[in-house]
């Protein structure tokens, strides 16, 4: 039985609001801590998570608590903060043994285990080197006037979302993202549905 502790900020059972898996039921496991410092910008383009606090749990305790939240949900999403700072094969194998498929939402600054089933890489506004070799989806948030970066990794899907702080419809940003997609048809528009319908 593993005694390593993982610091967890929160967990909840909800619907994935963005990306190619939007609309599907998932257990969310949010890890504390991040290796980037993203400052607030005028377009709401900052870190949307209070990730510094949390409690420590073992891998066995994490699995047990997730199954209390849902006994039948097949997917768990590892998010943060930056989950790659804490996760290891011991935790991933515990999740696999419990029957979970594993998705991760990462900034891409750390290499990832092959045990992860779905990689959603979302580089932040500050430029940083990506250490993941490839991703199932590469997601960027864009505000009005921001161009599309040239992807430095291979992905199955390339997605852009209009910057949205959840308080008002981001009409200008949305129209800009629509323009970007039309000009770059290999990209797809991805709305942050959970913010529009105000769910977690």
Where are these regions (language model features)?
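Flexible, acidic/Gly-rich N-terminal and inter-domain linker regions that tether
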Residues: 1-46, 183, 188, 197-199
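Conserved Radical SAM active-site core
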Residues: 6-13, 25-26, 36, 40-116
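Small/polar loops that bind or transfer phosphate-bearing groups
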Residues: 30, 80, 122
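Non-catalytic surface loops within mature trypsin-like serine protease
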Residues: 33, 51, 142-144
């Amino acid at each position: 039985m593993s005694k390593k502790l993982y610091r967890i900020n929160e967990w909840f059972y909800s619907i994935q609001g963005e990306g190619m898996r939007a609309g599907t039921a998932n257990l969310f496991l949010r890890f504390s801590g991040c290796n980037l410092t993203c400052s607030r910008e005028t377009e709401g383009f900052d870190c949307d998570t209070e990730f510094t606090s949390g409690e420590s749990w073992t891998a066995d305790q994490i699995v047990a608590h997730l199954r209390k939240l849902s006994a039948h949900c097949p997917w768990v999403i590892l998010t943060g903060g930056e989950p790659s700072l804490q996760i290891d094969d011991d935790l991933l194998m515990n999740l696999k043994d419990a029957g979970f498929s594993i998705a991760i939402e990462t900034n891409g600054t750390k290499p990832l285990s092959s045990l992860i089933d779905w990689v959603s890489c979302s580089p932040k506004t500050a430029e940083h080197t990506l250490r993941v070799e490839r991703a199932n989806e590469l997601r960027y948030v864009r505000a009005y006037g921001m161009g599309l970066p040239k992807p430095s990794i291979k992905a199955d899907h390339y997605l852009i979302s209009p910057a949205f702080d959840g308080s008002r419809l981001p009409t200008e940003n949305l129209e800009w993202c629509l323009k970007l997609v039309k000009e770059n048809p290999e990209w797809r528009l991805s709305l942050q549905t959970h913010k529009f319908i105000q769910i977690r």
